[in-house]
């Protein structure tokens, strides 16, 4: 019961005023990318754009749909959060959703347009079609195939030798 009271008291600090994280510059964020307590949570809607160019080490949790599920799976209780958003009008809603699931260490936010000046700190993710995998493995037998689907999907059908780890567990 005491733990519940402490939790409720902790949440009540936001009962009247939601935190308002400030807009950060790209240089402020880049300067902290190597800090293990900082997580960049990229909330933009366009998954293909995220895969093409995102800040090194950032996690993708699109603002729509299962944002809270993804964020709750990816984030640790002591991590500081920087949001990457499509537009400034999304910040308040994403902050509210993070607060509701217990994450209040929101350092600030960055508009997706700022990534254009993130020289040298952008990463990309190559998407591979299922039919391309055998050729990749033949080319390099040490290729690790990581199947990030849910357990039921993996058990129904998967590539021999693939390691199954749901994306929410990475």
What are these regions (language model features)?
Residues 1-18, 46-144, 148-170:
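Rhodanese-like catalytic fold shared by cysteine-dependent sulfurtransferases
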């Amino acid at each position: 019961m005491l733990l519940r009271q402490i939790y409720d008291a902790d949440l009540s600090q936001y009962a009247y005023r939601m935190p308002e994280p400030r807009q950060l510059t790209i240089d402020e964020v880049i300067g902290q990318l190597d800090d293990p307590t900082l997580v960049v949570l990229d909330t933009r809607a366009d998954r293909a754009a995220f895969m093409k160019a995102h800040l090194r080490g950032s996690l993708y949790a699109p603002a729509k749909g299962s944002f809270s599920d993804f964020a709750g799976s990816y984030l640790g209780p002591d991590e500081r959060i920087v949001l990457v958003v499509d537009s400034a009008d999304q910040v308040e809603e994403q902050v509210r959703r993070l607060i509701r699931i217990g994450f209040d260490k929101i350092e600030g936010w960055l508009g997706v347009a700022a990534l254009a000046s993130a020289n040298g700190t952008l990463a990309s993710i190559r998407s591979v079609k299922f039919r391309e995998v055998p050729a990749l493995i033949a080319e390099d037998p040490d290729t690790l195939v990581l199947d990030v689907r849910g357990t039921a999907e993996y058990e129904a059908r998967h590539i021999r030798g693939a390691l199954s780890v749901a994306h929410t567990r990475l």
